[in-house]
Amino acid sequence: MFVVSEMADFIKAGGLGDVAAALPRALRHRYDVRVLIPGYRAVLERAGKVEIVGRVLAHAALPACDIGRIVQSDGLPIYILLSKELFERDGSPYVSTSGSEFEDNAIRFATLSHAAAQIAAGHAGLGWKPRLLHLNDWPCALAAGYVRWSGGTTPCLLTIHNLAYQGLVPYSMAAALGIPAERVAELEFYGQMSFLRGGIVNADHVNTVSVSYAKQITGPAQGCGLDRLLAGRAAKGALTGIVNGIDASWDPRTDQYLDSHFSVNQWQGRQANAAQVRKAFGLRESAGPLFAVVSRLVHQKGLDLICEVAPQIVAAGGQIAVIGGGEPEIEQQVAELTRRYPGQVGAFIGFEEGLARRMFAGADFLLMPSRFEPCGLSQMYAQRFGCLPIAHATGGLIDTVDDGVTGFLFQHASVEALRRCLERAFRTFRLPSLLSAMRRAAMLRPSGWDVAGKKYLSLYEHTAATAPALATVP
């Protein structure tokens, strides 16, 4: 059972939602895969008729909840944890419409985690229980603890999509969350409790969403205070990395959001898409390169570096189109660039799926100077559409961008390193044969979920085989 706090079919706050929509489907040809997700208002609005099929009992301060079930049009079964009090509210899965975290997030996601453990134990009345729990990030991580603390033996795999989000709560909540007093230390994190740490300690296996990120988080620079624990798990062979895939809908030959389609052997559609992007962002017609930024506008994503090098890009004849939202200070910096360079820099603060896809389909380069990147999906979307990533060599960007072949990498998250990389990109743009060869290589790079799915199937079997109970996946 795939346990997750967001799923792009219904509601999405980040790349986790895309993974949750794609990975279970990539595995269904082999196993009976089902998904458990909270019953947010957006989920219920899109789910249609929900059949009540089970119920989980209250635990400490965690309320009892009904379990609903729907089946997607492609046959994927979805269990929905129903609680009007906890989940039916405005906002994203994690924050209110004002942008602040919900004060009861600990109760909300502990309830989700406990429900997963109860389903695994066969105590939810479903007439079915999974042979393995696949838990995703801190909102679901505590399920591994609830399984172990109740004497359960269901194998648990925990996937860390972003180690920076750890689900921190005060020690005073331990009793309310139903954590046994003798197990509280498993969650200890510098004077607080961490849901994610509890999952890392209790899961049978931990994986991250790229091979390089799995290595990086075992060191202090990227370990977010959990590096020693993760290094210990890695030493026992219980920490691995699998690069995410992207959905098959990202196909420039058929994409529903594109008016002008193209293929690896037929480029003309890219020019039409570029013209559309320039018009949408108020950019002048130009024969120079078009740089896209499709990102949250936050420090982690290196947006401050982009703002620093923007004058160089414009001076060299390039244009920049930015879509995204995030930290107010960076949003203001981007807005100032549009005022300083009208017709050369344009921005859309917010997000619109169709516009983002057209940017990938029309831009020449994608700017992605992330300070850290567990996997990253934008670089793979860009490659699929012939847009070459210019990326900081970190995490999944190392694993997915072949420097000088399918994009460009720079080694240090600094303005000077990014400037030197931009010079390489401009030189490539002035060599049409090289630019075409790189675009072709990028578009042909294998990045579908079939590759990642096979690796997850092997990891499921390994996790089940090495769990204490020696359970087997059906």
Curated annotation (Swiss-Prot):
Locate the coiled-coil region(s) and give their ranges.
none
- Specify which residues bind ADP-alpha-D-glucose according to the UniProt entry for this protein: K12
Q: In which pathway does it act?
A: Glycan biosynthesis; glycogen biosynthesis
Q: Name one Pfam family in it.
A: Glycos_transf_1
* Major enzyme class: transferase
Against InterPro entries, the record matches this protein to: Glyco_trans_1, GS/SS, Starch_synth_cat_dom
Reaction equations catalysed: [(1->4)-alpha-D-glucosyl](n) + ADP-alpha-D-glucose = [(1->4)-alpha-D-glucosyl](n+1) + ADP + H(+)
Q: Which UniProt keywords apply?
A: Glycogen biosynthesis, Glycosyltransferase, Transferase
Its Gene Ontology molecular function terms? alpha-1,4-glucan glucosyltransferase (ADP-glucose donor) activity; alpha-1,4-glucan glucosyltransferase (UDP-glucose donor) activity
Is the keyword Glycosyltransferase assigned to this protein? yes
Q: Where are the transmembrane segments?
A: none
Q: Which GO terms describe its biological process?
A: glycogen biosynthetic process
EC number(s) of the enzyme? Answer: 2.4.1.21
**Family stated for the protein in its record:** Belongs to the glycosyltransferase 1 family. Bacterial/plant glycogen synthase subfamily.
Q: Give the matching NCBIfam families.
A: glgA, PRK00654.1-2, PRK00654.1-5
Please describe what this protein does. Synthesizes alpha-1,4-glucan chains using ADP-glucose.
* Name of protein: Glycogen synthase
Q: Which organism is it from?
A: Xanthomonas axonopodis pv. citri (strain 306)
Q: Which gene encodes it?
A: glgA
